[in-house]
Amino acid sequence: MKSITYVSTATQSLSEAEFDAIAKVSVLNNSAANVTGILVLCGEFFLQILEGEEANVDATLERIRHDPRHRDIQVLKVEHDLLQRQFPDWSMQTVQLNHVNDTLIHGMRMMLGNLAESRYILERYTQPAVLKYIQDGVNPLEAPYVRKDKVILFADIAAFDTLSSFYSSEEVADHASAFLEVVSLAVTAKGGEVNKYMGDKLMAYFDPDHVDAAIECCLESLAKIRFLRSNAAQCRLRNFLYGGFGLALGPVIEGSFGSSYKMDHTILGNAVNVAARMVSFTRSTGRAIMVEESVMAASTKDWNWHQLGEFKLKGQMS
C-alpha cells in the first residue's frame, strides 16, 4: 500500500456546514476507492493523509489537484510498501479545528502556513529531478547512479563580465534573471530539464530523442531575447542582452554528487564538458548556436547547417 501526506490552502473560507458537506462526499468517494486516512481543516489550510492501494491513492490525489477548492498543494511525504493502514477504520476521518481554542488554532495555522511556505521556497531552489524522487517516495540520497545518453545544453550571456562592471548590482541581477527566465521557460516547454544555474550560465538536458526540441529551444530563446532588446525602453542593460548556446550529445552519469556538507543532483560526463566548450566558441565564431557533430547527426530536421570546421577542445585527447 501507499500513503501520501499533503498540505494545501483553501481557495475560500469554509463554514462548518460547508466543511461537513465536503467531509460527507470525501467519505463516500474514499469508501468506494478503499482509501482511508484523515482530513484536517485548520483556518485556511487542509492537511490530509491518504492511504490505500497505490493506483487508488494516486487517483484520489489527482482528483484533489483539480479541485478548485484547493490551491498550492504541497506533498510532504510519500511512503510505499506499507504493510498496514494507520487509519484502518476510517474511510476518511475529518477534523474541523476552527472551533477549538483560539490560541491553539492560531499556533496551528502558523505552523501549517510556515510549513507550506518553507516547502514552496525549497522547491524553488531544488532540482526538479529531486522533487520527483521525493514525490515518488524515493530518498534521493539512496537513488542509484544511472548512465544514459543526454542532449546537453549550455547557455550564457554575451559580455556579462564586462557589463557587470559598469552597471549596478540590481541591474546586473535583473539582466541575468531575464536571460535565465527566457531560456528556462523554453527548456521546460520543449521537454527538457534545467539542471543548474551558474551565475549568468545555465545547464539543461534533454532525452536523446529530443535533439530537435533542444535546437528549437535555442532558436525560440534567441527570438525572445531579440524581442526583449527591441522593447528595452528605459531598461539600459536590456539593449545589450545577447546569448550563446552550445549543444552536445553523449553518455553521462546522473545522480547525487557532493560531500557530507552539500549534495547536488546533476550529470557528469564528457558531453557536459563538450557542451560547455561549444558555448565558448560562439564568441570566436560570431554564431549564437554551436553544436558538435553528434547533435547534427541525430537531428531529423533540415536545419540548414553551416559547417565551421574542426575545433580543438581544451582537455580533449584528440
Regions found by a protein language model. Name each.
Residues 142-213:
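Catalytic NTP-binding/metal-coordinating core of nucleotidyl cyclase/transferase enzymes
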Residues 177-189, 208-245, 249, 274-279:
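Alpha-helical scaffold within the catalytic cores of cyclic-nucleotide enzymes
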Residues 74-76, 80-84, 238-256:
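A short glycine-enriched loop-to-beta-strand structural element that forms part of the catalytic core
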Residues 37-42, 193-197, 237:
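Short beta-strand
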Residues 284-318:
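Cytosolic regulatory/linker segments at or just downstream of nucleotide-handling modules
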Residues 248-249, 270-293:
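Catalytic/regulatory signature loops of cyclic-dinucleotide turnover enzymes
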Residues 257-269:
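Short, surface-exposed loop/helix-turn segments at secondary-structure junctions
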Residues 1-154, 162:
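Charge-rich, low-complexity N-terminal segments
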